[in-house]
Every structure is written in structure tokens, then in C-alpha cells.
């Protein structure tokens, strides 16, 4: 039995093994103490067993945490996919500043930025509007404005973050309002815009 008791001791550090060895010699006659030292030897041998358990628990928690994160990322990706789709839809509907529409959602923090990038797009048709007959030039802009209204409606229905497009449409209407001939058409439209916005 001595070697049997020796084996668990070896698994401990050599110092404690030495210590136990000494004890075992001492307590050769005392059986209860011997069994006690045996339990002592086995209890450190068991203590590593519970210790792998908490790690496995933490691993499980980590897995759950990772899964949650993955789900969150998937949700974010879905939202990101939805937004460009809608803005692309609006871009396809509004003929002139389509490039700007596509670029602006990529940097939502710079909301004033898209408006700046849209201004030149709106100023560009203005010279052509003055050279050509104004009614013809006014017609496309008004249709574009009404299309923007429809796009706004869709955006409101589809995505909660509707603040991406609304700042643009008033910017468009105000921008083209700079031209007096168009003022009539666009004033009515911009007021409708405001109704939609409110």
C-alpha cells in the first residue's frame, strides 16, 4: 500500500512529497492518520479536477458571448444592407445626384457633407435651366422633387433611420428655389416636403 500512497504524492510538488514521505514513516503505526494523509494526498490530486471545470464554464460563456456578438453583427449587417438598398432606390429615382446619394450614406456622421456634395449637383442644372426654356427645365426638377417625396415615404416606412435622406430633399428644394422662375413650382413641393417631414 505504501507505493499506492506514494503515487498520488509524486503528482504533487517534490517538497510536499518529501514532507508526506516523512509523515508516512512517522505514522506507520497510526492507521487513522495514515488514511488521513492519504486523503490529504488525494485531495490536492482532486483539486485540479474542479479547476478545469470553471474554465469549461467560462468557455461556454465565451461561446455564448461570441454567438451573441455574431448575432449582433448579423443584425448590424442587415441594417447596413437595408440602408444602401433604400438610398440606392432613392438614387435610382432621383436622376441627377445619383452618385452623391450613393456616396453619402457611407459616411452618415458627415450629414452636412452630403448636402454640400448635392449642392453642386443641383447648381449644375441651373445654368442649363437659364439657357433653355425655364418651363422645360422646371418640369424635371419638380418631378424629381415629387419622386423624392415618394422615396421619403418609402424610407420612412422601411427604415427607422430616416434622417439620412430628409435633410437632402429640403436642401434640393431650397437649392433650386434660388432660381426665381422655379420658385412657384418648388414652393408647393417643398411645403409638401415639410408635411412629410413633420
Curated annotation (Swiss-Prot):
Name of the protein this chain belongs to: Protein hunchback
Region (Disordered): 16-116, 158-198
Species whose genome carries this gene: Drosophila cyrtoloma
Function in brief: Gap class segmentation protein that controls development of head structures.
Family listed: Belongs to the hunchback C2H2-type zinc-finger protein family.
Any one GO MF annotation of this record: zinc ion binding
UniProt biased composition (Low complexity): 35-46, 68-83
Compositional bias per record (Basic residues), positions renumbered to this chain: 17-31
